[in-house]
């Protein structure tokens, strides 16, 4: 039976009209809900038998905020009229300016537009542990129902700017201390207390307070300006390329200088401008792209149910293995960690303990929970504990023969239902499992380092992997708070393959005479957290040197070969691992560019000898971004063409979560579509004419450029899934 969506009103014998929002699961404020609220508030205000009003959400949730689907519709059509009028017509006129008091009965959550409705009420009664916040900036917009004006007046300017700029939610308990919540009562008493409170206001026993007109928590103008100055510095630091943070501060300032209602009008104007910004389009796209990853054709739509995974064995206790073990333990999954000798095993155990300790010291985990997690952990040197595990994750070095032997051994000792997963990032799954008889149970579980912190899990499906195994691993991914993205089997899979040109393009530029520290600076200014040389230092240059030949074997027609990494290692520089790479790493301080590395770069330039006329090329920052990232887009096109991902948006979310491509740019494919396939094709064609096949446009990119199509528009008929 379909759940009813709408707004209802019931008037009790006490004269209180209870208006209820019903839109499962979180009572989001879709257009029909907003229309219903307007209708019911008009009705309640006009009826003589109504003394006061209580606003509540159905099924123990007040409201999760405005319906994000509307943003998506606006982005597709460019039609702002799809955005309903809420801020003035409903929130100000019908609710806050109502002659009859309105009390919000808050349970579960009041987020975004939900909290904004609650703040327009004349009082707020809440149950404990309700979640309160204004997360709109994470979608590229600002609060649009008066939140920029009312929150500072209820909790103070400093706390309000902190909550809004950082999209930080608080509990109803904290809200009560701050004055956002007027009364905190047991869940069963929220409605009855709200009714009584509303009547007490109506009959003069409690004050009739309009949040928009309060000034008692704003402070003096000079104090407000000092807080806003700090807020601008914070915005510059956390969101240098995004407009919504600075716009939000401007709107808050408008209300402080010219009054709350003036601020509301400015907020509505700025909100509409931001809705159509590239930033909002990118962030909303990422939101829906993440949702879409949970739908995998012929896996999630064929009636299968995930099997419980209660015990997992991890083989290899290095950086990756210990991180994977940590992630599993944090979700109360028993873990057996296997190593080849006692020394390596102790290192692995200590790494897991250090991960837990770090989370506790940063306030991300309580000591009790860390202790409970570690009680589920056991280290072993043989396979005796493997007979009852539900899954094995192999996380040893990238050695084909070693991995083949491990899979042959675990097939013998594990139960027939056990999932056999590899964390390989470069080796073909079919090759790893070719000596086994259990090819349907073999799957890639590619975590990103550090595995207990990075949010992406690439689930790699070979031509033999069963749908049940994929579904089981997707469930495990969600249980350990990862975003699982199912991809096809190829060298590098989706993320590493798409981004392998990233460091190569940077090496080409450096060998063409461009300053490598400038390259890193330009790329971080674009929005990636690390430039290509910083990333190389972080990963360790030994890894780059080891995987290079694997990629060259398969993708050799479009690789740039540079001696720079080898020269770096020969000079004793392995990056952050040993304190020196392109940068100097000292404990307690930020990495510093190492000028002495330039002699190595110069040697590499002489050996490659690609500078035109022996002189460094001159490039703009824009050209650096294009020469680094357009080859990445080009490889993304090949990934799409070969059907390595189910949909283009899967590659977007994988690029954001796996390579930290800026979410506000929507992911690598979305960004490329924003720039324009034709422009990218023409630039790559020109670059290939000057610098060779590394930049040669792919067939997929050329087709879309010539036909005026977006890269995301058409899925390849080929599939590796």
UniProtKB/Swiss-Prot annotation:
UniProt-recorded Gene Ontology molecular function terms: 3-hydroxyacyl-CoA dehydrogenase activity; 3-hydroxybutyryl-CoA epimerase activity; delta(3)-delta(2)-enoyl-CoA isomerase activity; enoyl-CoA hydratase activity; NAD+ binding
- Where expressed (tissue)? Widely expressed.
Q: Which domain of life is it from?
A: Eukaryota
Knockout phenotype, as recorded, reads: Reduced rosette size, twisted leaves, and abnormal and sterile flowers.
**What EC identifiers does the entry list?**
4.2.1.17, 5.1.2.3, 5.3.3.8, 1.1.1.35
User: What compartments host this protein?
Assistant: Peroxisome
What UniProt keywords are attached to this protein's entry?
Answer: Fatty acid metabolism, Isomerase, Lipid metabolism, Lyase, Multifunctional enzyme, NAD, Oxidoreductase, Peroxisome
Q: In which pathway does it act?
A: Lipid metabolism; fatty acid beta-oxidation
- Record-annotated active site: 116, 136
According to its UniProt record, which reaction does this protein catalyse? a (3S)-3-hydroxyacyl-CoA = a (2E)-enoyl-CoA + H2O; a 4-saturated-(3S)-3-hydroxyacyl-CoA = a (3E)-enoyl-CoA + H2O; (3S)-3-hydroxybutanoyl-CoA = (2E)-butenoyl-CoA + H2O; (3S)-hydroxyoctanoyl-CoA = (2E)-octenoyl-CoA + H2O
Is Amino-acid biosynthesis there in the keyword field? Answer: no
In its keyword annotation, does this UniProt entry include Isomerase?
Answer: yes
Sorted alphabetically, the Gene Ontology cellular component annotations on this record are:
peroxisome; plant-type cell wall; plasma membrane; plasmodesma
Ranges spanned by the short sequence motif Microbody targeting signal, renumbered to the chain: 719-721
Record-level GO BP terms: fatty acid beta-oxidation; flower development; jasmonic acid biosynthetic process
Positions the record marks as coiled coil are none
- Domain comment (free text): The epimerase and isomerase activities are contained in the N-terminal region while the dehydrogenase activity is in the C-terminal region.
Give the protein's function: Involved in peroxisomal fatty acid beta-oxidation. Required for wound-induced jasmonate biosynthesis. Possesses enoyl-CoA hydratase activity against short chain substrates (C4-C6) and 3-hydroxyacyl-CoA dehydrogenase activity against chains of variable sizes (C6-C16). Possesses cinnamoyl-CoA hydratase activity and is involved in the peroxisomal beta-oxidation pathway for the biosynthesis of benzoic acid (BA). Required for the accumulation in seeds of benzoylated glucosinolates (BGs) and substituted hydroxybenzoylated choline esters, which are BA-containing secondary metabolites.
Entry similarity comment: In the N-terminal section; belongs to the enoyl-CoA hydratase/isomerase family.
Record's protein name: Peroxisomal fatty acid beta-oxidation multifunctional protein AIM1
> What is the originating organism of this protein?
Arabidopsis thaliana (Mouse-ear cress)
